[in-house]
């Protein structure tokens, strides 16, 4: 294009404007993506639930004290109009927006927390930790291994209903 630099220069968006844009994009993606995988060959294709999960994380970050009314950013202003890049007023509704997206994911009934059954290696927990059966307590599961195995790859892929970040196995060790 032959447009001038001035015509191609736009003021930087605020953090809240960026979050709104990203959330809108994830909403649109969730509408276009399937709610379930049609076959094992499509394991690399994200589902609508994955898009909503990412949207919820973005909204949770925006609701956090780091970006929601944090006075640390008081001097971060757009030079064209003096608007703060980071909103200086705490907004509790940001938490509600994030929670609403999380609730939509829960209400699909398609997802569950990954757990590893308790066994002889499961540690004994302090008295202040409920031993009621999961999800009301730690009864019947090994919370440490349940969390740890999500990151170590210890769980066989055949037992996992959805991969959010997947990579084909490579046995080429050279």
Question: Across the structure, where does each feature detected by a protein language model lie?
Answer:
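Structured, solvent-exposed acidic/aromatic patches
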Residues: 1-174
């Amino acid at each position: 294009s032959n447009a001038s630099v001035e015509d191609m220069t736009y003021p930087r968006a605020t953090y809240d404007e960026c979050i709104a844009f990203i959330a809108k994009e994830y909403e649109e993606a969730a509408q276009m993506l399937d709610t379930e995988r049609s076959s094992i060959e499509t394991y690399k294709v994200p589902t609508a639930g994955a898009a909503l999960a990412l949207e919820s994380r973005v909204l949770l970050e925006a609701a956090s004290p780091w970006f929601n009314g944090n006075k640390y950013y008081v001097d971060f202003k757009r030079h064209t109009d003096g608007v703060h890049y980071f909103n200086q007023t705490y907004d509790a509704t940001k938490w509600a927006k994030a929670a609403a997206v999380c609730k939509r994911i829960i209400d699909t009934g398609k997802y569950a927390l990954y757990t590893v059954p308790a066994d002889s290696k499961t540690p004994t927990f302090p008295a202040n930790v409920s031993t009621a059966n999961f999800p009301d307590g730690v009864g019947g599961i090994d919370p440490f291994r349940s969390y740890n195995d999500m990151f170590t790859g210890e769980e066989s892929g055949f037992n996992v209903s959805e991969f959010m970040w997947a990579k084909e196995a490579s046995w080429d060790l050279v």
